[in-house]
């Protein structure tokens, strides 16, 4: 039964830290959302008497790590009626919002803000560059025409505000938050010490942590499931390519209605809705909405179909979030490998195995199985194609988890990068992922060449007033 967490547990309080930092409501792709968040803080710092005029903006400078650059290149932004793309536009919208709300900063963007943001980008008032390092990094510098400046840095995670400055002097971000202009999810960098604790955990500890799920935390886990189910419903109505193709396969008798088909359809719908700019939030996991879909929907839909008790379903989803966070503590926030396969996927497949057989042996086998299947799936940036990747991951998640739960080790044990234990497998996978880090700059170069310098993109169909600027200003 679900109850209160045991107070003397070696992992006491750790799951609450994971929920606070990594399982958050998120509107749209989280990398542009984090850029908008930083930009909104920068604008909030410079608000004078509660007013902020875009006419007084001289320049918005955005610097991000290669992973953020990659994931912000081609994904559609929420609040743009399905037309806005690119990190420069996300930053411009965040500045105009001047109301930092974590990964939901772009909520409520109106037509006027869209038009003003498009003009800022088209008039080259927004600059974008990339760092060489692989660590998660976002910096937004805002310069006004009167010379006043602000600077915000986010490091170590999507809402982890590391530094806020006005005119090159530190400003306590907590003071801004307490005035009602921040978000409950922004935290100082020092609070990331929970990741050190996670790295020291065994999988036995992780399973025990999920088993101690409190009533309050179980409600939050269920809230995340409900949010992602709602998002999937919106995605079904949108009928984007990944969803339409799966439906056509059933119509043409290529696949049949089944639990497997339903899981793939629901994750495709939720993911394609996010990548398509739907103004409906997801509950994220590990700082990613798509990974939130991955960690919640396959285990939940499986459990409901198999009449697994509700408390075990929720504990299994808690385990999925925990394992995703555990993997992130080793791999980093933005790995070159697809997170839906190598971190959230590992959590989700372990959750399914846990529902069938809640033992360390079954969970370990699930980790080994999925690693043997799809550990090498590449992340080439957030886009419509993410829905297809999540479908492939969901298919493997179900197979790997069921096989493990029913006692079948698909890898045959330690082979390739699969280790003898779950911990060893994760460490082996981490070695491979660290070796892949030079790929991100190369992928970004390919994206630029493939899409005609997509990082400068703004609107697929710009507002008329923004179009009028194109004859005067170079884009």
Residue ranges of each PLM-predicted region?
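Conserved phosphate/anionic-ligand binding catalytic regions in large, soluble enzymes, centered on
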Residues: 23-41, 277-297, 339-343
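Alpha-helical support elements that line or immediately flank enzyme active sites
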Residues: 32-50, 292-309, 349-357
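Flexible, glycine/charged-enriched surface loops at secondary-structure junctions
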Residues: 49-59, 102-107, 128-130, 216-222, ...
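Membrane-embedded translocation segments of transport machinery
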Residues: 253-261, 265, 274-308
């Amino acid at each position: 039964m679900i109850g209160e967490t045991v107070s003397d547990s070696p992992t006491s309080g750790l799951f609450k830290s994971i929920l606070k930092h990594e399982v958050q409501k998120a509107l749209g792709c989280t990398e542009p959302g984090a850029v908008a968040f930083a930009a909104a803080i920068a604008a909030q710092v410079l608000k004078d008497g509660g007013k902020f005029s875009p006419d007084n903006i001289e320049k918005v400078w955005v610097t991000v790590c290669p992973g953020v650059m990659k994931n912000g290149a081609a994904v559609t932004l929420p609040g743009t009626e399905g037309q806005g793309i690119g990190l420069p536009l996300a930053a411009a919208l965040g500045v105009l919002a001047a109301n930092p709300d974590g990964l939901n900063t772009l909520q409520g963007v109106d037509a006027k803000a869209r038009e003003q943001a498009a003009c800022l980008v088209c008039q080259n008032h927004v600059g974008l560059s990339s760092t060489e390092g692989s660590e998660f990094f976002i910096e937004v510098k805002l310069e006004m025409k009167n010379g006043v400046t602000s600077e915000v840095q986010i490091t170590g995670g999507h809402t982890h505000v590391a530094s806020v400055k006005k005119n090159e002097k530190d400003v306590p971000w907590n003071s801004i938050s307490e005035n009602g202009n921040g978000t409950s999810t922004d935290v100082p960098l020092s609070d990331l010490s929970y990741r050190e604790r996670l790295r020291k955990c065994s999988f036995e500890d992780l399973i025990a942590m999920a088993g101690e799920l409190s009533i309050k935390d179980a409600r939050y886990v269920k809230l995340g499931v409900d949010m992602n189910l709602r998002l999937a419903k919106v995605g079904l109505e949108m009928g984007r390519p990944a969803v339409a193709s799966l439906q056509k396969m059933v119509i043409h008798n290529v696949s049949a209605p089944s639990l497997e088909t339903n899981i793939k359809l629901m994750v495709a719908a939720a993911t394609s809705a996010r990548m398509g700019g739907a103004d409906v939030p997801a509950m994220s996991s590990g700082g990613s909405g798509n990974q939130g879909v991955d960690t919640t929907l396959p285990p939940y839909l499986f459990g409901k179909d198999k009449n697994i008790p509700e408390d075990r379903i929720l504990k299994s989803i808690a385990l999925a979030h925990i394992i995703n966070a555990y993997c992130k503590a080793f791999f980093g926030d933005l790995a070159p490998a697809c997170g839906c396969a190598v971190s959230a996927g590992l959590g989700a497949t372990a959750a399914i195995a846990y529902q069938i057989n809640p033992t360390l042996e079954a969970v370990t086998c699930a980790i080994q199985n999925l690693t043997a299947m799809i550990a090498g799936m590449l992340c080439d940036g957030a886009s419509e194609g993410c829905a297809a990747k999540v479908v492939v991951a969901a298919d493997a998640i179900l197979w790997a988890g069921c096989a493990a739960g029913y006692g079948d080790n698909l890898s045959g044990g330690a082979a390739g990068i699969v280790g003898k234990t779950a911990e060893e497998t994760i460490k082996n996978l981490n070695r491979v992922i660290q070796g892949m880090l030079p790929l991100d700059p190369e992928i970004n170069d390919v994206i630029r060449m493939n899409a005609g310098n997509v990082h400068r993109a703004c609107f697929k169909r710009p507002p008329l007033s923004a179009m009028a600027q194109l004859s005067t200003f170079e884009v």
